[in-house]
C-alpha cells in the first residue's frame, strides 16, 4: 500500500462523534512514531481536536489545512512538530473557517482532489499519513477519501454501532464508483470496549463475523487515561505509558505496520 514507496495514507472515519476517531488518530500516530515511522496527522475536523490534543495551536494568522484545501498553501508549509517522537500535525484552523471551506467544496459541480494533490506533492517524506475526518460524511470527508489509500473505521462497542458503518459503507461505495476505484474500508477498530460485558462482546462478535481479518485483533478498552490525555495535550503513550490504552494502541500499530520497516532517511 502507498504509491512508489511513499506514505500509506489512511482516512480515519465514522459518521458519529465520540467513537474514538480523533483519539485513534492521536494515539495510533504516536504508536507508529514510537516504532520509528515518520507520521503526519492531517486534522480535517472543524473542532481541531487532533491539533489541540497534541499541543498544536496555530496562530490566527498562520496557514492551516484550510489554506491547503483552497490551494493557497502547500501542505509541507503548514506542518507543525509535536512533543511525540516522529509525529507531526497539519493543523486545523480555529473558528468556522473549515466549515466555510466545506461550503466552497459543496459548490463545486464535481469534487476536486484538492487534498490528494497536496499529499501527493510530499507523500515521499512520510511513512504514514493519518487523515482525521470530520464526524460527518460531507465534502471534507469525501476529499479525504479521494486522497486515502484505505479507510480505518472506528467502531464503538455500543448499540447501533453497525448502523453508522452502513452509512459509511454507502459513501465509500459512491466515492469508489465515481471518484476513487479500489477504495475500501480496509481496517475496523473496536473502541471503548468494556471487556467481557455482554454488549461489548456482542458488537465485537458481530463485527468479526462480518469483516473477518479486516478487524484489528487488538481492541481499545474504555480507559480513563485515554480520556485524560487530550487535556494534557499529549498522547496516552506519553501521559500513561503502561496503561491499558497505551498498550492497546501499540498493539494496533504493530498490526497495521505488519513487519513494514520505516524508510531510511
Q: Where are the language model's segments positioned?
A:
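P-loop NTP-binding core
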Residues: 1-265
Amino acid at each position: 500500500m502507498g504509491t512508489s514507496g511513499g506514505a500509506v495514507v489512511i482516512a480515519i472515519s465514522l459518521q458519529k462523534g465520540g467513537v474514538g476517531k480523533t483519539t485513534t488518530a492521536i494515539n495510533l500516530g504516536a504508536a507508529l512514531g514510537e516504532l520509528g515511522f515518520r507520521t503526519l496527522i492531517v486534522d480535517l475536523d472543524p473542532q481541531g481536536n487532533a491539533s489541540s490534543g497534541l499541543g498544536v495551536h496555530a496562530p490566527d494568522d498562520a496557514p492551516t489545512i484550510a489554506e491547503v484545501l483552497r490551494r493557497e498553501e502547500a501542505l509541507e508549509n503548514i506542518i507543525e512538530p509535536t512533543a511525540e517522537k516522529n509525529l507531526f500535525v497539519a493543523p486545523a484552523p480555529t473558528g468556522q473557517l473549515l466549515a466555510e471551506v466545506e461550503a466552497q467544496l459543496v459548490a463545486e459541480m464535481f469534487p476536486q482532489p484538492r487534498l490528494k494533490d497536496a499529499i501527493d506533492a510530499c507523500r515521499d517524506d512520510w511513512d504514514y499519513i493519518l487523515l482525521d475526518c470530520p464526524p460527518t460524511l460531507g465534502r471534507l470527508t469525501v476529499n479525504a477519501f479521494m486522497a486515502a489509500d484505505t479507510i480505518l473505521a472506528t467502531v464503538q462497542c455500543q448499540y447501533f454501532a453497525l448502523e453508522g458503518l452502513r452509512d459509511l459503507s454507502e459513501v465509500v461505495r459512491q466515492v469508489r464508483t465515481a471518484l476513487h476505484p479500489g477504495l475500501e474500508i480496509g481496517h475496523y477498530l473496536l473502541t471503548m470496549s468494556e471487556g467481557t460485558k455482554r454488549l461489548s462482546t456482542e458488537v465485537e462478535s458481530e463485527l468479526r463475523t462480518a469483516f473477518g481479518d479486516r478487524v484489528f485483533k487488538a481492541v481499545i478498552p474504555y480507559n480513563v487515561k485515554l480520556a485524560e490525555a487530550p487535556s494534557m495535550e499529549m498522547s496516552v503513550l506519553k501521559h500513561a505509558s503502561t496503561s491499558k490504552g497505551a498498550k492497546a494502541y501499540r498493539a494496533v500499530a504493530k498490526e497495521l505496520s505488519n513487519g513494514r520497516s520505516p524508510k531510511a532517511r
